[in-house]
């Protein structure tokens, strides 16, 4: 049976707490990105010294043609100003004045802006994980949404809130490419870097399901193709932005009927000999197993060794086995003809018996959970065992009764261990959530973290009610509204600091979005996916990384564009400053094909080999995108205007 709602919420809270504990690794990663950007700024300054001498007459002619195309859509006054400057107005002028001058920042004050940006990344992760997402969970419960629809709507908005607000700021405030760059960079990061990190550090080979990956990848590919078509002319109209939003509504409908579509997909692929992963990578399973449910259960148990609950109901309904008299009696007593108390008791007993059968079956596999041997297994009932035939023997001649007895003892010990683990986890959940400003944790490292996050904890403690706590549970709408405001504020501060850093170092806004902003907003999701992959749930890690990209492109870009062109200034266009974005989005499309093709060649398994390949491709994407934006291959960007 599926875990209850309380167990789901407890598991999600533990996952969020573990993400918070990975603060040090997140800071180290962002520091390395900042060091990379500093190196790029040095190369940028060296290149700009003799830029006009190196480009030659052909490059000057291309720049003039670029200016003529832009001036066609500007007023005469703006065109004259743009023509006289031969540069792009920096987005820094759309923000309040900085307390430091550009010279002060070049002398070292920019480090303070880097630290502030990193702190904003962490603040966004805390607000999203501990306040925004729990409030969305409460909303989904009140609306009685299915898991698929809730995941495609509210949960996607919760995980992609920083990217969405960054895009809103890029459209309405900076009027530049920082939002588009962040969405594109975050999308590539989610596909290549997250899958690469999960493959390298999961600690095990994780099997992937073809259905989730193909479903999200196909629709994601259509979304990227639509984005390429719409931004090819460097402007987006109102109907193009509306198409993106409508495509996401279609995606929600697909998720609503995901189960029916999945069944059709399984019926088409089942004839090819695929039972679990949707492809013929399970040929090593012996044909004599006849796709028995034991195979599925054992294969699933291989990745959930410590789980106290296994979803046996769906697997047994899909792959039924011959029932004994006692089993049939238990199943009859869970129907609506009996009182609720009896139904609950019989359902619990049936699940215990099915788990007993799973453990007993594992005793005959000689440690190989990939192969199941079809031997009729006795099921323990309340006062004894069911009817049995002559004593059966295992594959090594061991008497079956002895093995069953040993397996029963192991089951009892395992259940006791699981109960103890659950009690410990429940005790830990009492202390879950963000740090409180008035309770100092124990341990030096925890104290340092508490001191580092004290200003953030102090502000959030008095402004955002924690709906995870029973006394604030009914205030989830207040939590939703206040956390949304804080996400908007932190996103504004984050984009402001990153814009200052890019202007000081001479790096275009789109590059800052593709690298620094994309990494900063996606590192928490990367850590969460790694935790999920270590638990053996590779499908969830990969599906979440690709599914969130669908939201980023269709809603993260489509919604702000639609608001600007339909509500704020009807009939206007969203203009892109950088022609290089079309190349970056093209690389994004290529990364989807390469990733799915690589997973297929790797027999739908997530391992270190696949992880290294994905990380290598991510490095290639960064290098190519940065060199393109710096006009190394062809002219795509006007230089950024200086102070004077």
Curated annotation (Swiss-Prot):
It is a multi-pass membrane protein. GO terms for molecular function: calcium channel activity; calcium, potassium:sodium antiporter activity; symporter activity. InterPro entries: K/Na/Ca-exchanger (IPR004481), NaCa_Exmemb (IPR004837), NCX_ion-bd_dom_sf (IPR044880). It is found in: Cell membrane. GO terms for biological process: bone mineralization; calcium ion transmembrane transport; intracellular calcium ion homeostasis; monoatomic ion transport; negative regulation of gene expression; positive regulation of gene expression; potassium ion transmembrane transport; sodium ion transmembrane transport. Residues 409-433 have a biased composition (Acidic residues). GO terms for cellular component: cell periphery; plasma membrane. Residues 129-153, 204-210, 256-484, 532-549, 602-615 are cytoplasmic. Keywords: Antiport, Calcium, Calcium transport, Cell membrane, Glycoprotein, Ion transport, Membrane, Phosphoprotein, Potassium, Potassium transport, Repeat, Signal, Sodium, Sodium transport, Symport, Transmembrane, Transmembrane helix, Transport. Abundant in the brain. Expressed at low levels in the aorta, uterus and intestine. Alpha- repeats lie at residues 149-189, 518-549. Glycans are attached at residues 71, 86. It comes from the Eukaryota. Its main location: membrane. Residues 45-107, 175-182, 232-234, 506-510, 571-580, 637-644 are extracellular. It catalyses: Ca(2+)(out) + K(+)(out) + 4 Na(+)(in) = Ca(2+)(in) + K(+)(in) + 4 Na(+)(out). The chain crosses the membrane at residues 108-128, 154-174, 183-203, 211-231, 235-255, 485-505, 511-531, 550-570, 581-601, 616-636. Pfam families: Na_Ca_ex. Calcium, potassium:sodium antiporter that transports 1 Ca(2+) and 1 K(+) in exchange for 4 Na(+). This is Sodium/potassium/calcium exchanger 3. It comes from Homo sapiens. The gene is SLC24A3.
């Amino acid at each position: 049976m599926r875990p209850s709602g309380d167990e789901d919420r407890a598991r999600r809270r533990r996952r969020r707490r573990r993400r918070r504990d990975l603060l040090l690794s997140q800071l180290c990663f962002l520091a390395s990105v900042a060091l990379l950007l500093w190196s790029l700024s040095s190369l940028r300054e060296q290149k700009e010294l003799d830029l006009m001498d190196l480009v030659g007459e052909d490059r000057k002619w291309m720049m003039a043609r670029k200016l003529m195309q832009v001036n066609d859509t500007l007023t005469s006054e703006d065109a004259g100003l743009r023509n006289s400057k031969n540069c792009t107005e920096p987005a820094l002028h759309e923000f309040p004045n900085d307390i430091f001058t550009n010279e002060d920042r070049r002398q070292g004050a920019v480090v303070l802006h880097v630290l502030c940006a990193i702190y904003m990344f962490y603040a966004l992760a805390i607000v999203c994980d501990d306040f925004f997402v729990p409030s969305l969970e409460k909303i989904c419960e009140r609306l009685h949404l299915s898991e698929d629809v809730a995941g495609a709507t509210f949960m996607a908005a919760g995980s992609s809130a920083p990217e969405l607000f960054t895009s809103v700021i890029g459209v309405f405030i900076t009027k530049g490419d920082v939002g588009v760059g962040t969405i594109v960079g975050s999308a590539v990061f989610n596909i290549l870097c997250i899958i690469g990190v999960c493959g390298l550090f999961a600690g095990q080979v994780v099997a992937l399901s073809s259905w989730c990956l193909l479903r999200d990848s196909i629709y994601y590919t259509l979304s990227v193709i639509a984005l390429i078509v719409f931004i090819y002319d460097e402007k987006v109209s109102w109907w193009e932005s509306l198409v993106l939003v409508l495509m996401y509504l279609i995606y929600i409908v697909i998720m609503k009927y995901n189960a029916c579509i999945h069944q059709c997909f399984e019926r088409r692929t089942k004839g090819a000999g695929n039972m679990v992963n949707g492809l013929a990578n399970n040929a090593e399973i012996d044909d004599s197993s006849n796709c028995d449910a034991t195979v599925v259960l054992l294969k699933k148990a291989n990745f959930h060794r410590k789980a106290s609950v296994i979803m046996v109901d769906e697997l047994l309904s899909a792959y039924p086995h011959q029932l004994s008299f006692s089993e049939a009696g238990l199943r009859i007593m869970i129907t609506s003809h009996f009182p609720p108390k009896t139904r609950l008791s019989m359902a619990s007993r049936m699940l215990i018996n099915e788990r007993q059968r799973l453990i007993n079956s594992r005793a005959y596999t000689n440690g190989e959970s990939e192969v199941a041997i079809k031997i009729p297994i006795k099921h323990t009932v309340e006062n004894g065992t069911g009817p049995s035939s002559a004593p059966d023997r295992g594959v090594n001649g061991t008497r079956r009764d002895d093995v069953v007895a040993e397996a029963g003892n192991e089951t009892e010990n395992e259940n006791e261990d699981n109960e103890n683990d659950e009690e410990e986890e429940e005790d830990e959940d009492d202390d879950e959530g963000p740090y409180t400003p008035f309770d100092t944790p124990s341990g030096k490292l925890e104290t340092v973290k508490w001191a580092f996050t004290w200003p953030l904890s102090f502000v959030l403690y008095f402004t955002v009610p924690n709906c995870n706590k029973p006394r604030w549970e009914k205030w989830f709408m207040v939590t939703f509204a206040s956390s949304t405001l804080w996400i908007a504020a932190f996103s504004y501060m984050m984009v402001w600091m990153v814009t200052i850093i890019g202007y000081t170092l001479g790096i275009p806004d789109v590059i800052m979005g593709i690298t620094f902003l994309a990494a900063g907003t996606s590192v928490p999701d990367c850590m969460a996916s790694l935790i999920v992959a270590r638990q053996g749930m590779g499908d969830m890690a990969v599906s979440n990384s690709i599914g969130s990209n669908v939201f980023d492109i269709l809603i993260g870009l489509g919604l702000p564009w639609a608001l600007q062109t339909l509500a704020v200034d009807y009939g206007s266009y969203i203009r892109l400053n950088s022609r290089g974005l079309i190349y970056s989005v093209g690389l994004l499309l290529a990364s989807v094909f390469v990733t799915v093709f690589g997973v297929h060649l790797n027999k739908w398994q997530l391992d270190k080999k696949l992880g290294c390949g994905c990380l290598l491709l991510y490095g290639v994407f960064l290098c190519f995108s940065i060199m393109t934006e710096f006009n190394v291959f062809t002219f795509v960007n006007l230089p950024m205007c200086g102070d004077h």
